Amino acid sequence: MSRGNAAAAKGKKKGVSFTIDCSKPVDDKIMEIASLEKFLQERIKVGGKAGALGDSVSITREKSKITVTADGQFSKRYLKYLTKKYLKKHNVRDWLRVIAANKDRNLYELRYFNIAENEAEEED
């Protein structure tokens, strides 16, 4: 009997939240944060349908950060994949990369590739 009560208590879905920090490219005016937000709203699939976020997934924008909050399960790898796809579509994938900025891996950051290191290696 106690088993059923434990299952009912665990029935609550925990929400996950991921943040994409785009401050460096937005400050340099390489990309617009609004276009990334729109891209994510159109492309995130919920229940096999793209663009139908409903109440389960919400996307918010604050200055140069986008926060994706999901009520149920949401893959961090999927968010990284979509961000890379956006960068490729806007021809900035050669200069920017998506990396996890903290240990919990719920904060992604768009950073520039270190081109200075590559130029130093080519000179040798």
From Swiss-Prot:
One GO cellular component term, please give it. Answer: nucleolus
Q: Does the keyword NADP apply?
A: no
Per the UniProt entry, the signal peptide is none
Q: Which family does it belong to?
A: Belongs to the eukaryotic ribosomal protein eL22 family.
Report the InterPro entries cross-referenced here: Ribosomal_eL22, Ribosomal_eL22_sf
Question: Which keywords has UniProt assigned to this entry?
Answer: Ribonucleoprotein, Ribosomal protein
This chain belongs to the protein called Large ribosomal subunit protein eL22y
Pfam families in the cross-refs: Ribosomal_L22e
Q: Which cysteines are joined by disulfide bonds?
A: none
Give the Gene Ontology MF terms in alphabetical order. mRNA binding; structural constituent of ribosome
Q: Which organism is it from?
A: Arabidopsis thaliana
Q: Which GO terms describe its biological process?
A: translation
